[in-house]
Amino acid sequence: MPRVKRGTKRRAKRKKILERASGYYLTKSKLYRSAKESVERALKFAYTGRKQKKRQYRSIWIVRIGAAAKLNGLSYSRFISGLKKAGVELDRKMLSEIAIHDPQAFAVLAEQAKAAQPAAA
C-alpha cells in the first residue's frame, strides 16, 4: 500500500478556510489556526443569527399590529383574539403589511375583531 501524504487535500482544506477568512483583521485572515477559529465562530454566529431573525421579524410584526390596533381602539391581544373568533385567518406578517400599506382595510379588520368580542362587563 503506498503512503499518502495528503499534500493537495491539506492545501485545498487550508485554502478554503483562508478564503472564507479573507477580510478578517490581522492574523485572523493570514494564519490558518487563527483563521479556522474565526471562521468556525463566524459560522456559529451565522447559524444562531438565522434562528434569531425569525424571532425578531415576528416581534416587529407584533409591534406594528399593536400600534395599528391602538389607533383603532383595541389592544393587540384583544385584536388578535377578536380576529380568531371572527374566523379571520391572516397571519401576523400579512396583518402588519396591511397595517402599514392599507390602514382602511386594517380598520375594517379591527371592526370585525370588535364585533366578535363579547360585550365588556
Curated annotation (Swiss-Prot):
Tell me, which GO biological process terms does this entry list?
ribosomal large subunit assembly; translation
Query: Which protein is depicted?
Result: Large ribosomal subunit protein bL20
Q: What does this protein do?
A: Binds directly to 23S ribosomal RNA and is necessary for the in vitro assembly process of the 50S ribosomal subunit. It is not involved in the protein synthesizing functions of that subunit.
Q: Which UniProt keywords apply?
A: Ribonucleoprotein, Ribosomal protein, RNA-binding, rRNA-binding
Record bears the keyword Plastid: no
Q: Which CDD domains does this entry report, sorted A to Z?
A: Ribosomal_L20
Look up the record and report any one GO term of the cellular component aspect: ribosome
Which Pfam families does the UniProt record give? Ribosomal_L20
- Keyword Nucleotidyltransferase among UniProt keywords: no
Query: What is the similarity comment for this entry?
Result: Belongs to the bacterial ribosomal protein bL20 family.
Highest taxon, organism lineage: Bacteria
What does UniProt list as this organism's lineage?
Answer: Bacteria, Pseudomonadati, Acidobacteriota, Terriglobia, Terriglobales
A single GO molecular function term of this UniProt record: rRNA binding
